[in-house]
Amino acid sequence: MRALPVVDADPRERKFVKLGRLAQLAGVLPSTIRHYMRLGLIGADAQTPGGYGLFDPERALPRLRRIQDLQSQRFRLIEIASILVGENGVGAA
């Protein structure tokens, strides 16, 4: 697991959003994103001093949309993980 930068400033002053806001923007439940995180499909970009994950919506939203698109094509999440690795050349980033 990679070390995440800690963001001391108020996340509203930065481009980062918390998981709940990312879920709202993506139109999914926070538990869906947590599940994707457990599977390595998506990861936080930074964290608060308290350890909460922060996400760059410019990076995370396209990835969530890609996951949703692949699911609509009937791919299983394990298959989606392989596809994303192949597309990006890396894991969940």
Region roles according to the model:
Residues 1-25, 38-39, 43-49, 54-93:
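Arg/Lys-rich, alpha-helical DNA-contact motif
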Residues 29-32, 38:
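Short coil turns linking two alpha-helices in DNA-binding domains
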